[in-house]
């Protein structure tokens, strides 16, 4: 019997779990407004990019990190309830699609997000985040 297929499946499961954990760490850092934890999740490079709802795309870790500093200095913290999360791992890249259901003192809403991760020597790092507001259902 060939155990290589089982080994590949175990590797895939471990990678998927690691990507899910890194994705969760991103949202935990966001909720806590923790710049150090947010920095730990991201790849610090020129290829990092971030598109917050209503913003243009930011390129490079400097611009991305500055955006988190500005957002964390905002009026009220956010709580995320994540739904419809799907994870795909292909080699050294992975992506998560997820609906971010937001709760804040100002109200809430839903953002459809895509988070792109790359494998680094010490784990998975977020290299791109894109969030688009979802129109409220009537």
Segment roles from a protein language model:
Residues 2-37, 48-138:
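A beta-strand edge to alpha-helix "cap/lid" segment located at domain peripheries
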Residues 43:
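Helix-to-beta-strand junctions that scaffold the AdoMet/dcAdoMet cofactor pocket
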């Amino acid at each position: 019997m060939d155990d290589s297929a089982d080994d590949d499946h175990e590797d895939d499961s471990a990678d998927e779990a690691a990507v899910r954990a890194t994705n969760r760490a991103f949202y935990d850092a966001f909720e806590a407004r923790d710049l150090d934890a947010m920095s730990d999740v991201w790849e610090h490079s020129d290829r990092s990019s971030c598109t917050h709802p209503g913003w243009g795309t930011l390129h490079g870790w400097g611009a991305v990190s500055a955006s988190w500093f500005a957002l964390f200095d905002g009026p009220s913290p956010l709580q995320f309830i994540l739904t419809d999360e799907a994870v795909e791992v292909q080699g050294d890249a992975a992506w998560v699609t997820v609906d971010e259901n937001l709760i804040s003192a100002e109200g809430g809403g839903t953002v459809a997000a895509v988070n792109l991760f790359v494998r680094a020597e010490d784990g998975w790092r977020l290299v791109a985040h894109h969030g688009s507001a979802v129109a409220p259902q009537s």
